[in-house]
Amino acid sequence: MGSEMCIRDRLREKYSLKCLSKNRIGTKQLLNNFKNGESIALLADLQLSSGINLNFFGKRMKFSSLPAQLALKSGCKIFLGWPIRKNDGKFEFEIHQSIHASDYKDTSDNVEKISEIIIAYYESMIKKYPEQYFWFHNRWKLD
């Protein structure tokens, strides 16, 4: 994990990125950044203790509903992107599609529907680049 930390730290420094914790303080900071009109990137494939249960590669797993909830409450767009490691070892970040939350009413059904779109996108990208994705945790843990 040492080299991963170095990459993260270099990206933070180069692009003035702020990483927030998955706790109440981090959530409060995230909402403040959001209200201030800042762009927000969420790494929504992290292991969660809470969330909604969805199918991912044919198995049930917990998935964060935060991207869908934020988008529905604000009417903002969700851009689905993926970092691709190139042959020279550098990464290129590609954005493939967007979800226009303003097309949906703010309901729990639509939180699930948007979350399913996001997770289907993850599945498609992992299938396309399986050698570039690795979980460091038990992804299908439901408790």
List the model feature ranges, each with a label:
Residues 24-143:
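Non-catalytic C-terminal accessory region of glycerolipid acyltransferases
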Residues 1-7:
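Short, small-residue-biased leader/transition segments that mark boundaries at the very start
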Residues 8, 12-16:
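Membrane-proximal helix-turn-helix segments that form the acceptor-binding/catalytic region
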Residues 18-22:
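Short acidic-hydrophobic, aromatic-tinged amphipathic segments that line or gate anion-handling sites
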